[in-house]
């Protein structure tokens, strides 16, 4: 069901919080690094098995000097300057993460509407599309109080709609969404988590 009610958020950002774009950048960067898959990985000459014995003596053979069969010049040797699948991490304190989420949520305060989830007997994308209000072409974030499997599966095929639990809210979907829907049950959870007061 859709309820044509907008929320008023009774919280004013102080002057310091209004200029904390760097905190939003750090929070978004931390999340993107945490979900990135570092797939490409090559081994250096030190990581290749074997190559401990010198192939031939240093002088007197007429051949080029060689100290290991695992040199990058050799077939079966290591790779010089290849990609290294080393995961990069960026630490973000808990207080910083909550403050960044609050700032992003406050920036989206004019895009918030109350939309309560319908009751579904079984997952169906067609049914949920008929029951929900017309979806805009721009992304919509739907914040719910709990994870309903039927509702989650029904909305999975809708590209412009993303569902998230209120207790798992973070910066990226708030910045991604052009419109935000919140269920009635999710309001007290958000008020407690973000330390804001919302009123219909």
Swiss-Prot record:
Protein's cellular compartments: Plastid, Chloroplast
Pfam families cross-referenced by the UniProt entry: Ribosomal_L4 (PF00573)
Keywords attached to this entry: Chloroplast, Plastid, Ribonucleoprotein, Ribosomal protein, RNA-binding, rRNA-binding
GO MF annotation terms: rRNA binding; structural constituent of ribosome
InterPro entries cross-referenced by the UniProt entry: Ribosomal_uL4, Ribosomal_uL4-like, Ribosomal_uL4_dom_sf
Bias (Basic residues) ranges: 51-68
Top-level taxon in the UniProt lineage: Eukaryota
GO biological process terms held by the UniProt record: translation
Family: Belongs to the universal ribosomal protein uL4 family.
Name assigned to this protein: Large ribosomal subunit protein uL4c
Organism placement in taxonomy: Eukaryota, Rhodophyta, Bangiophyceae, Cyanidiales, Cyanidiaceae
